[in-house]
């Protein structure tokens, strides 16, 4: 800016010298007009310079923002959960998570799911997606908390004072498939046979030999009891 002002000042001095030496009206009018333009421009430049200085004095150094590392994403599979009358609480342990910026810990809720994303924690991103929650939750009232080395996801139950036996519908279905099915109207011995049959089918060779031996001994004992009568 100083060089521009200097050039304008030199132009102005030169125009003044020419004006003093000029005698012809047309030339003097042209020089007078040019002199006015230069003076106006010089005045504006000086005002800009005086206004710019306080702005620079008040200007604070720009905050250095650490670049967001795009490292690979780790899928979170280990977590714990419990519940109260109003909330289902999911606990995820991530060492150092309390030290990352708040905006780096994001949770998106829907009525039957949540999606956790932790960005740039020790050079990695961490993701946890849980779909098909056992029961509906209130999206607006659900939230997250970041504690020392822990993220707590708070899913607000849509129906308060109801108990969740499982976190997801899929978990419920898997557990129920594992349970042996009993028919209350069927013969109790038939139910036992079904259980033994399942154990036999799923067991190894040693288990099968043990069941076969027990089965033979049971049949022999039953035969002896029948002959006694």
UniProtKB/Swiss-Prot annotation:
Residue numbers spanned by region Disordered: 38-60
Tagged with keyword Nucleus: yes
Family annotation (CDD domains): p23_CacyBP
Location of the protein in the cell: Nucleus; Cytoplasm
GO cellular component, one term: beta-catenin destruction complex
Tissue: Highly expressed in brain and EAT cells. Expressed at low level in heart, muscle, and at very low level in the liver, spleen, lung, kidney and stomach.
Location of region: Interaction with SIAH1: 2-81
Keyword vocabulary terms for this entry: Acetylation, Cytoplasm, Nucleus, Phosphoprotein, Ubl conjugation pathway
CS domain ranges (all copies): 74-168
GO BP, sorted A to Z: cellular response to leukemia inhibitory factor
Modified residues (N-acetylalanine): 2
Any single Pfam family the record assigns to this protein: CS
Post-translational modification N6-acetyllysine, affected residues: 10, 21, 86, 119
Region (Interaction with SKP1): 74-229
Signal peptide annotation: none
Protein name: Calcyclin-binding protein
